[in-house]
């Protein structure tokens, strides 16, 4: 039993010091959460809104930096899964999951993204970029997420403890993993038999750990084959089974975290997707020594896999290369692009010896024979279950159309399926498919994922895989179970191999996506072979190994190969494209027309013409073997050679005739008409011969089918590739004819269906139009009835509600009249206030005019005083400067007195002038005050007048509206509108009243004060004088 079942603690609580261990039992979290139900019950420990960079964003590209980030709600669970969804509702399915148990580091992403508060979560699969709104949020997330890479790095340094094996019999999964680990790891101190996987998560981790251990020391290429060790069991496994395991091994080599990885999606298998492999191969360092394409083991695997390709042609969808003469051109490209790189690791482990001589130079290498015999000797020692072992998740369709996911295990000519891998350990079988009765496995289009069907005598079983690569691997593996490969008898196939080495044609491998980019830089010869493959991509993309090529293309390919020079040391030219053949034919027709135009004489038909018709371009035939008697294969070769060369007469004998005729010494020449008739006869004869040859071809095809049927049951030698190709070409012709018949029948059915569809559509359109017209008429009648009914109901309701409306209108009229009276009263008050303000304004204006008059008087008086002062000053000056003799004779006392009086008088005049200035300034201030008062009064008057005008207009509108409502009400009641009901307007002139007060007190007081002041000043001046 697994450790997870023995663990009584089912609830994981992180330890304070080690987050990957349980607080209760101190066991890893993988031993607690075993199924999806436990995953959904996990407790969230942190969450919040974050911004996620879109998938596939390359921040090194400036265009991608402007992409809009996606706002998602992130939740971190206690088992280490970071999930994000569109909202925070717990019922919302997450859009994605980041397994923090595989996280290698969490770093600041501002340098990469150019965005503040961003983080980069590094995992072996990809990089995830998240961003927060503030620094506090991103700091909290960084603190929570950094626990996982730190724990992973700590666990990397610790050596894992492996549980001892249980005494029960190990299942197929255990046998496969232990055997592969024992063959691939020789330097490990822990015995590989003890590495028994316990659960779904530990199985994957143990598989990766066994792949992580270093391989055996590779032998140098210079060592002889006798010194090399026999290949291990893992190296003898089929390439289709081994490729996925090596891919997972390569990915485990590059994993930074050493803790056990838990599969979150529940889909556990030894396969990986193409995207994962592509990313891993970019990180994988180049191999130390590339394998030589001409090693014996490589050639042995090529020849053996040709038998597999013949048996599982519909499943593999590819074409294998024959053993070519050139060592650089016979490199097998593999059955899919994903195996190109892992196969190199196989060859490095198998220690390739020195390169062998060319296959065309020597019929068969002794090393090759030794390797084949070595394989025969080592294969029985290998457990068949290990060679054919495969397991993984697939979905099965039941009879009711329901799909259910199962854990499938392929071994011992049966395909068993369980509920999950734990059920496999417990031998809890859900069902089994017997592959001994299986005769075919084909791809089948389904709605879910990538489907395929297993055809057995009992029935058909429909399954589906997650990816096309997984489906292809399953089909290939199942087909190998259906048609197991047997080691050929090398001794009995030596002469046939000689024939094959001299006349083999180069077939076209199936092109794979991005294969050339992954294989590194090839040598120049390999580049040329790839260029030939790229020229053939037009055909190879259209036709696979299971999709037969048309027989015309096969004949054209072999014809082009036969016409060329018979050089067996070079691969023959690939088949010409249809466009090139058309251009060649058009060119020949043009040359024929020109040469016929040059013929101006006729030449009688004779023996030369008969000999001429027999001149054809013959390509060198296939060399016959003198070592064996003529068997069925030799006869087929001869017949095919006749079929290949016969269609060339029709095109190639015509250009020879003008050349031959032009070499005549000016004799009689054929006319154009006679030459045309001869050519037509010759064409008919050629067609007759071609029909006879086609009949013979059909007979030979029947013989070939019988021979292939005999050889299928007990095949002990190599099969000539050219023979197989021709057999497939014949089957391809019949298949093409059937397809054409089916297409024509399908086209006829489509035309019938289109006509039926058009007829039904026309009938349906006519019926729809008539139904629409009937519905329109019915709708119109119904509308008319509804309108009459509604009018009657409205009239009755109006008659019943007229009295109520009349009372309501009267009440509203009375209320409006009351409001109007209130408004008129307010209006009269406003008018009265306006009149008072107007009177006050008039009084202010009068006071202003009075002030202006007083100001003028004061200005005149001031002018008079100034004049008097000037006269007095001049008089004083004349007194001071008038009589010099009098001054000399006068007494000093009189002079001093006069000077004092003059000073006093001058001071008095100055003080009077100062007072007058003050008076003028005070008058100016009063004038400005009066002007401000006037402006304020006029503004207030305007505002009040505007308000009164608005109120009057509003009242008039209300009165007119109420009159109209009243008139409408009286008309509805059937009464005449009351002419006497008129509301008298308010006369603004009537409300004006002359006020009996005037603001004259202030002006009188100021005027009296001014008079008093002016009198006192005049008296003082007169006294001083």
UniProtKB/Swiss-Prot annotation:
<feature type="region of interest" description="Disordered">
    <location>
        <begin position="560"/>
        <end position="591"/>
    </location>
</feature>
<feature type="modified residue" description="Phosphoserine">
    <location>
        <position position="1014"/>
    </location>
</feature>
<feature type="modified residue" description="Phosphoserine">
    <location>
        <position position="619"/>
    </location>
</feature>
<feature type="modified residue" description="Phosphoserine">
    <location>
        <position position="993"/>
    </location>
</feature>
<feature type="modified residue" description="Phosphoserine">
    <location>
        <position position="977"/>
    </location>
</feature>
<feature type="compositionally biased region" description="Pro residues">
    <location>
        <begin position="284"/>
        <end position="294"/>
    </location>
</feature>
<feature type="region of interest" description="Interaction with F-actin">
    <location>
        <begin position="2"/>
        <end position="383"/>
    </location>
</feature>
<feature type="region of interest" description="Interaction with RHOA">
    <location>
        <begin position="546"/>
        <end position="824"/>
    </location>
</feature>
<feature type="modified residue" description="Phosphoserine">
    <location>
        <position position="224"/>
    </location>
</feature>
<dbReference type="GO" id="GO:0005829">
    <property type="term" value="C:cytosol"/>
</dbReference>
<dbReference type="InterPro" id="IPR039597">
    <property type="entry name" value="M-RIP_PH"/>
</dbReference>
<feature type="modified residue" description="Phosphoserine">
    <location>
        <position position="289"/>
    </location>
</feature>
<dbReference type="GO" id="GO:0051015">
    <property type="term" value="F:actin filament binding"/>
</dbReference>
<feature type="modified residue" description="Phosphoserine">
    <location>
        <position position="493"/>
    </location>
</feature>
<feature type="modified residue" description="Phosphoserine">
    <location>
        <position position="1016"/>
    </location>
</feature>
<dbReference type="GO" id="GO:0045296">
    <property type="term" value="F:cadherin binding"/>
</dbReference>
<feature type="compositionally biased region" description="Basic and acidic residues">
    <location>
        <begin position="524"/>
        <end position="545"/>
    </location>
</feature>
<dbReference type="GO" id="GO:0015629">
    <property type="term" value="C:actin cytoskeleton"/>
</dbReference>
<feature type="compositionally biased region" description="Low complexity">
    <location>
        <begin position="179"/>
        <end position="189"/>
    </location>
</feature>
<feature type="region of interest" description="Disordered">
    <location>
        <begin position="317"/>
        <end position="383"/>
    </location>
</feature>
<feature type="compositionally biased region" description="Basic and acidic residues">
    <location>
        <begin position="567"/>
        <end position="589"/>
    </location>
</feature>
<dbReference type="InterPro" id="IPR001849">
    <property type="entry name" value="PH_domain"/>
</dbReference>
<feature type="domain" description="PH 2">
    <location>
        <begin position="387"/>
        <end position="483"/>
    </location>
</feature>
<comment type="subunit">
    <text>Binds F-actin through its N-terminus. Interacts with MYZAP. Binds RHOA, PPP1R12A/MBS and PPP1R12C/MBS85 through adjacent coiled coil domains.</text>
</comment>
<keyword id="KW-0206">Cytoskeleton</keyword>
<feature type="modified residue" description="Phosphoserine">
    <location>
        <position position="226"/>
    </location>
</feature>
<feature type="modified residue" description="Phosphoserine">
    <location>
        <position position="292"/>
    </location>
</feature>
<feature type="modified residue" description="Phosphoserine">
    <location>
        <position position="365"/>
    </location>
</feature>
<feature type="modified residue" description="Phosphoserine">
    <location>
        <position position="265"/>
    </location>
</feature>
<feature type="modified residue" description="Phosphoserine">
    <location>
        <position position="663"/>
    </location>
</feature>
<feature type="modified residue" description="Phosphothreonine">
    <location>
        <position position="348"/>
    </location>
</feature>
<feature type="region of interest" description="Disordered">
    <location>
        <begin position="152"/>
        <end position="302"/>
    </location>
</feature>
<keyword id="KW-0597">Phosphoprotein</keyword>
<feature type="compositionally biased region" description="Basic and acidic residues">
    <location>
        <begin position="271"/>
        <end position="281"/>
    </location>
</feature>
<dbReference type="Pfam" id="PF00169">
    <property type="entry name" value="PH"/>
</dbReference>
<keyword id="KW-0009">Actin-binding</keyword>
<protein>
    <recommendedName>
        <fullName>Myosin phosphatase Rho-interacting protein</fullName>
    </recommendedName>
</protein>
<feature type="modified residue" description="Phosphoserine">
    <location>
        <position position="220"/>
    </location>
</feature>
<feature type="modified residue" description="Phosphothreonine">
    <location>
        <position position="295"/>
    </location>
</feature>
<feature type="compositionally biased region" description="Low complexity">
    <location>
        <begin position="217"/>
        <end position="236"/>
    </location>
</feature>
<feature type="modified residue" description="Phosphoserine">
    <location>
        <position position="192"/>
    </location>
</feature>
<feature type="domain" description="PH 1">
    <location>
        <begin position="43"/>
        <end position="150"/>
    </location>
</feature>
């Amino acid at each position: 039993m697994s450790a997870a079942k023995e663990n009584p603690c089912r609830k994981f609580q992180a330890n304070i010091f080690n987050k990957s261990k349980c607080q209760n039992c101190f066991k890893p979290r993988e031993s607690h959460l075993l199924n999806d139900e436990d995953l959904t019950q996990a407790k969230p420990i942190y969450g919040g809104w974050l911004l996620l960079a879109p998938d596939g964003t390359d921040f090194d590209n400036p265009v991608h930096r402007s992409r809009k980030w996606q706002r998602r709600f992130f939740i971190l669970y206690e088992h280490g899964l970071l999930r994000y969804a569109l909202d925070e509702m717990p019922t919302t399915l997450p859009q994605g999951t980041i397994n923090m148990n595989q996280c290698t580091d969490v770093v600041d992403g501002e340098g990469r993204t150019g965005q503040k508060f961003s983080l980069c979560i590094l995992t072996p699969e990809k990089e995830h970029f998240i961003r927060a709104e503030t620094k506090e949020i991103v700091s909290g997330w960084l603190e929570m997420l950094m626990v996982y890479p730190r724990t992973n790095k700590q666990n990397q340094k610790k050596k894992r403890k492996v549980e001892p094996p249980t005494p029960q019999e190990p299942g197929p999964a255990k046998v496969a993993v232990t055997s592969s680990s024992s063959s691939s790891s020789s330097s490990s101190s822990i015995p590989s038999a003890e590495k028994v996987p316990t659960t779904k998560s530990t199985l994957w981790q143990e598989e990766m750990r066994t792949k992580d251990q270093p391989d055996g020391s590779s032998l140098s290429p210079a060592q002889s084959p006798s010194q090399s060790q026999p290949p291990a069991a893992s190296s003898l496994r089929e390439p289709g089974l081994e490729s996925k395991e090596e891919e997972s091994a390569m990915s485990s080599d590059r994993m930074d975290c050493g803790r056990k990885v838990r599969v979150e999606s529940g889909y556990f298998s030894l396969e990986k997707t193409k995207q994962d492999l592509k990313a891993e191969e970019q990180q994988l360092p180049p191999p130390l020594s590339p394998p030589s394409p001409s090693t014996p083991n490589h050639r042995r695997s090529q020849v053996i896999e040709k038998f597999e390709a013949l048996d599982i042609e519909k499943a593999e969808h590819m074409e294998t290369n024959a053993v070519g003469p050139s060592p650089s051109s016979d490199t097998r490209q593999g059955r899919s692009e994903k195996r190109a790189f892992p196969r190199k690791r196989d060859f490095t482990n198998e220690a390739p010896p020195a390169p062998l001589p060319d296959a065309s130079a020597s019929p068969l290498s002794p090393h090759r024979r030794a390797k084949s015999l070595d394989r025969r000797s080592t294969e029985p020692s290998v457990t068949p279950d290990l060679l054919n072992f495969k397991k993984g998740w697939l979905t099965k369709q039941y009879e009711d159309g329901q799909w259910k996911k199962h854990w499938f295990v392929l071994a011992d000519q049966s395909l068993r399926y369980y509920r999950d891998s734990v059920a496999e350990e417990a031998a809890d079988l859900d069902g089994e498919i017997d592959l001994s009765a299986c005769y075919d496995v084909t791809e089948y289009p389904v709605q879910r994922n990538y489907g395929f069907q297993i055809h057995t005598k009992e029935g058909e079983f429909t399954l589906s895989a997650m990816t096309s690569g997984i489906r292809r691997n399953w089909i290939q593996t199942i087909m190998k179970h259906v048609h197991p490969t047997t080691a050929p008898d090398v001794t009995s196939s030596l002469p046939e191999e000689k024939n094959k080495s001299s006349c083999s044609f180069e077939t076209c491998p199936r092109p794979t996506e991005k294969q050339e980019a992954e294989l590194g830089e090839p040598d120049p010869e390999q580049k040329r072979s790839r260029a030939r493959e790229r020229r053939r991509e037009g055909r190879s993309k259209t036709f696979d190994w299971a999709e037969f090529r048309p027989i015309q293309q096969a004949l054209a390919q072999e014809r082009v190969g036969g016409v060329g020079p018979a050089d067996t040391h070079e691969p023959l030219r690939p088949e010409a494209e249809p466009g090139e053949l058309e251009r060649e034919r058009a060119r020949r027709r043009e040359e024929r027309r020109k040469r016929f135009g040059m013929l101006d004489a006729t030449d009688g038909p004779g023996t030369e013409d008969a000999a001429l018709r027999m001149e054809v371009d013959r390509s060198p035939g296939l060399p016959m073997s003198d070592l064996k008697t003529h068997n069925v294969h030799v006869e087929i070769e001869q017949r095919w050679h006749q079929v290949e060369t016969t269609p060339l007469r029709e095109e190639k004998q015509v250009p020879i005739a003008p050349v031959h005729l032009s070499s005549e010494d000016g004799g009689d020449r054929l006319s154009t008409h006679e030459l045309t008739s001869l050519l037509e006869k010759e064409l008919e004869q050629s067609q007759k011969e071609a029909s006879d040859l086609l009949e013979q071809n059909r007979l030979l095809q029947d013989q070939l089918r019988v021979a292939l049927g005999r050889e299928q049951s007990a095949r002990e030698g190599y099969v000539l590739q050219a023979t197989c190709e021709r057999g497939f070409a014949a089957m391809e012709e019949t298949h093409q004819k059937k397809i054409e018949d089916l297409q024509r029948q399908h086209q006829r059915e489509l035309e019938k269906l289109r006509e039926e569809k058009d007829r039904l559509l026309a009938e349906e359109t006519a019926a729809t139009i008539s139904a629409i017209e009937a519905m329109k008429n019915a709708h119109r009648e119904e509308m008319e009835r509804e309108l009459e009914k509604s009018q009657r109901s409205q009239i009755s309701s109006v008659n019943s509600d007229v009295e109520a409306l009349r009372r309501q209108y009267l009440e509203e009229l009375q209320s409006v009249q009351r409001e109007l009276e209130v408004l008129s009263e307010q209006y009269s008050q406003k008018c009265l206030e306006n009149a008072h303000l107007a009177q006050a304004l008039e009084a202010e204006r009068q006071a202003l005019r009075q002030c202006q008059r007083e100001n003028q008087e004061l200005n005149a008086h001031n002018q008079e005083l100034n004049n008097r002062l000037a006269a007095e000053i001049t008089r004083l000056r004349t007194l001071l400067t008038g009589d010099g003799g009098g001054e000399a004779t006068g007494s000093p006392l009189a002079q001093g007195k006069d000077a004092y009086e003059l000073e006093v008088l001058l001071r008095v005049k100055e003080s009077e002038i100062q007072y007058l200035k003050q008076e003028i300034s005070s008058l100016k201030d009063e004038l400005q005050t009066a002007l401000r008062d006037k402006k304020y009064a006029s503004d207030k008057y305007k505002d009040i007048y505007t308000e009164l005008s608005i109120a009057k207009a509003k009242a008039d509108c209300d009165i007119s509206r109420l009159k109209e409502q009243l008139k409408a009400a009286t008309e509805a009641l059937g009464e005449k509108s009351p002419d006497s009901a008129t509301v008298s307007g308010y006369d603004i002139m009537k409300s004006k009243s002359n006020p009996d007060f005037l603001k004259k007190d202030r002006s009188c007081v100021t005027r009296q004060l001014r008079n008093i002041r002016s009198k006192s000043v005049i008296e003082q001046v007169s006294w001083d004088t």
